[in-house]
Amino acid sequence: MSFTTRSTFSTNYRSLGSVQAPSYGARPVSSAASVYAGAGGSGSRISVSRSTSFRGGMGSGGLATGIAGGLAGMGGIQNEKETMQSLNDRLASYLDRVRSLETENRRLESKIREHLEKKGPQVRDWSHYFKIIEDLRAQIFANTVDNARIVLQIDNARLAADDFRVKYETELAMRQSVENDIHGLRKVIDDTNITRLQLETEIEALKEELLFMKKNHEEEVKGLQAQIASSGLTVEVDAPKSQDLAKIMADIRAQYDELARKNREELDKYWSQQIEESTTVVTTQSAEVGAAETTLTELRRTVQSLEIDLDSMRNLKASLENSLREVEARYALQMEQLNGILLHLESELAQTRAEGQRQAQEYEALLNIKVKLEAEIATYRRLLEDGEDFNLGDALDSSNSMQTIQKTTTRRIVDGKVVSETNDTKVLRH
């Protein structure tokens, strides 16, 4: 980091003939200051420029007025020698004063240089924090994208679970319908069994009735034969041969047996077919129900795993949010600290600028005094060199001419140290 401090001082005074006398009135002409700082703390430059003009006539306490009054009152060479002696004494005192002021000026310049070296404006480099901030922002963005992707996966899993739930409900309804059909078929089987039992009961009753009728017929035949035998009569009846009741009963019995057998076979065949169909349907439905139960179990496991994943993702999201809040709070605190440091540095910089301006003003005042003394010394030296040829009236007549001495001091400061200093003095005539 480098600073360039430039101070420009200009002093105007009127000339007295061939000698220079300082003017005691002062009027600041211009004062300008500029500050430039590059990004990152490099290439910073502070430039201070001041220009002060002093102009005016000789006051009642000035040197020219004293000389004019002394010479006008005396008018003799003796008085001029006494005046020159007093001027020599004053010159010696002025030289001592100039030497002391130069010493004080060097001391002030050394203090200014030390102050600039110690409390030079410094700007810390925060560029390495920018990389960390960018990395954290990239991580936050990646975590946000991951959270969005996880939320999308959760939504897809929820939709898939809803589809499986609909399929499960459909299969459950089909299973209930099949179970209802099976229950109805079981009722039909029960009714058929009851009908079969009723028919078997009727067959048994018919068999008993047939046996009873056969027994009665045999008893009647035996009774008739006994009556015929006891009467001793031979009765010949020219009549057709009577039918054999036993044969008829046997035929009837055979017919009933055949009918019962056919009915039994038909019923057995029908109910066997119905039972086979029902068994096939039940087997098919049982297989479908088993598959549906297997699918339901898998869906339940999938839902449980998805719920576990959802809980883990929620926990991960909560932890990431907590981490994000902690990072934001930590970096907010660091930013506050950095802002505080920046404000402190700006305050120190403002104080340094104010101190520099104050010291520059003091230096300017001392420089003005030095210029005045140098002008008076030049005047005294000219008086001593000219001797009796000095004409105060000519000096007063030429007092309208004015010269400006402009002194520019440029200092280059790198990392709080003065690496170069240049002084430039210009004399401008008006």
From Swiss-Prot:
Heterotetramer of two type I and two type II keratins. KRT18 associates with KRT8. Interacts with PLEC isoform 1C, when in a heterodimer with KRT8. Interacts with the thrombin-antithrombin complex. Interacts with PNN and mutated CFTR. Interacts with YWHAE, YWHAH and YWHAZ only when phosphorylated. Interacts with DNAJB6, TCHP and TRADD. Interacts with FAM83H. Interacts with EPPK1. Interacts with PKP1 and PKP2. It comes from Homo sapiens (Human). There are two types of cytoskeletal and microfibrillar keratin: I (acidic; 40-55 kDa) and II (neutral to basic; 56-70 kDa). Residues 388-430 are annotated as: Tail. The keyword DNA repair does not apply. Residues 80-391 form the IF rod domain. This is Keratin, type I cytoskeletal 18. Phosphorylation at Ser-34 increases during mitosis. Hyperphosphorylated at Ser-53 in diseased cirrhosis liver. Phosphorylation increases by IL-6. Proteolytically cleaved by caspases during epithelial cell apoptosis. Cleavage occurs at Asp-238 by either caspase-3, caspase-6 or caspase-7. The gene is KRT18. Changing S7A: No effect on phosphorylation. There is a cross-link at K426 (Glycyl lysine isopeptide (Lys-Gly) (interchain with G-Cter in SUMO1)). The modification Phosphotyrosine is found at Y36. The lineage of its organism: Eukaryota, Metazoa, Chordata, Craniata, Vertebrata. It comes from the Eukaryota. Residues 133-224 are annotated as: Coil 1B.
